[in-house]
Amino acid sequence: AGDLSGDAENRIEDVMILVLEQENGKYVYRYMTEGERLESTGNSAQFQAKLLSTTKPVKLMLAGNYGDAFAAYAPSPGRSEAEVKAGIGCSFTGAARSLPMYGEIAVPSGLEADRENRFSVKMLRAVARIDVEKDLTADSRSLRIESVRLYRPNDKIQLAPDESFAP
């Protein structure tokens, strides 16, 4: 364990964009591309990405600080949104430096080729943080934590949440 500064908790060092297109009322995976020219300052980051134009509604899934998540996993075009989300996971290696993050945005109008498409996406950390504070005085009782329980069925960090995402 260790302490992360506020900057380290919010820093985004790399981002992968997974593009899903609506087909028969459901989103299906099409392709992914890496964010370029990433600039991270304070609580925000800006980047550029080359995306294919489409008039169909799209959903952009963003994986920030994704580590080795795509080293052995590349979703196949046509996969469902749930399958893609379930497959995105990374090891704990490097997680103490920059926390893995996830965000998504639906773009009902699709992506236009003749103009710059700009979006603001809130990112959710894949790792929870709990701060415990106790004010101490001369007659304070000591703080004792009986137990801390964390559950993870494997050795991977799950980037995308299971339930609907609403930061």
Question: Residues of each region from the PLM?
Answer:
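Sec-type signal peptide cleavage vicinity
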Residues: 1-167
